[in-house]
Regions:
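Intrinsic-disorder/low-complexity loop/linker signature
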Residues: 25-26, 42, 63, 112
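Basic, glycine-/proline-tolerant helical and adjacent loop/strand elements
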Residues: 1-39
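Context-gated lysine
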Residues: 6-7, 13, 31, 54, ...
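C-terminal, charged low-complexity interaction regions
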Residues: 64-142
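Long, charge-rich C-terminal accessory regions
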Residues: 32, 39-84
Length: 142
């Protein structure tokens, strides 16, 4: 949504930071990390993604981050706000949001078990698959 706005629209309709976004004072987004385990590796493949959330969730998470609270809340529910072109359509996939200590982006988990991304997140991917995804992404950006 934000990416499709003209610059003038962004300046008047959107308030965006590195981890939060509000559009038209009615649409609320949080940024999180979706980790896909790479089999045989300690490091996962990490997607930095936006999730749309209800205003109440946005406000509670904002308070948590702003006040530096120790107690983690959630998990929260949201909807993926990105289309990952290397997968079948991901826009609006149900997502679970788990807060991490302040200063760390929330972890995201896809809630629709039949989707390829959810299956890969649950079972992990081979190094070859991780390289394939990375290669597809690099070639798309050109």
């Amino acid at each position: 949504m934000y990416a499709n706005m003209k610059r003038e629209e962004r300046d008047t309709r959107a308030l965006i930071g590195s981890d939060q976004c509000v559009i038209d004072e009615q649409r609320f987004f949080l940024r999180g990390c979706l980790e896909v385990p790479i089999l045989g590796s300690e490091e996962p493949f990490v997607w930095g993604l936006w999730v749309s959330v209800k205003e109440e969730v946005y406000d509670e998470v904002s308070d948590f981050w702003t006040l530096g609270r120790e107690k983690l809340h959630g998990p929260y529910k949201g909807r993926l706000a990105n289309s990952l072109t290397v997968y079948p359509e991901t826009l609006n996939l149900k997502t679970e949001i788990s807060l991490q200590p302040v200063g760390t982006r929330p972890l995201l988990k896809i809630g629709e078990a039949d989707h390829l991304l959810a299956r890969e997140q649950s079972a992990g991917i081979s190094r070859a698959r991780a390289m394939e995804v990375a290669s597809l992404l690099l070639h798309q950006e050109r």
